[in-house]
């Protein structure tokens, strides 16, 4: 029993030393490359531990704007890295996992936007921040869940096409009944 416990403790210590060495290497690389690490709440705890900033996508986008570092390593889904690049075109934005994606971000298309534009007069296309750069490019305004109601109320347009999240659109429509909402069928598969 004693030998078994010693071996387990030894293995734990080896893992701790490796983790410390990796953290030290990351810190050194951040200095050499003038880089900062942003991590979304959804990433693994060990990634959050080495990050300079941890938060939701809106918080991290705001943080990204004020950074002095030339390289942003964004640990999150692709639309978050795209948003950081849009807000910081002069900086290098790296995504450690290019396969990290949010399916809802792709649940609308430029073609759908143009189709709806052709069917409605006095239309504003309102895009939730959790969407691709392509959707943002075809929209009139981009909002977050915390500012969407205020922005939609302030829009002069009567018709609102909210993309890509139908659930957030329904919520906003309930608070802004004077607008006519056209619903996209996008949704978050995690929250559905």
Q: For each predicted feature, which ranges?
A:
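Active-site loop-to-helix "anion-binding N-cap" substructures in soluble metabolic enzymes
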Residues: 20-192
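Histidine-centered metal-binding segments
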Residues: 4-5, 40
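Short, Lys/Arg-enriched N-terminal segments with co-localized hydrophobic residues
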Residues: 8-19
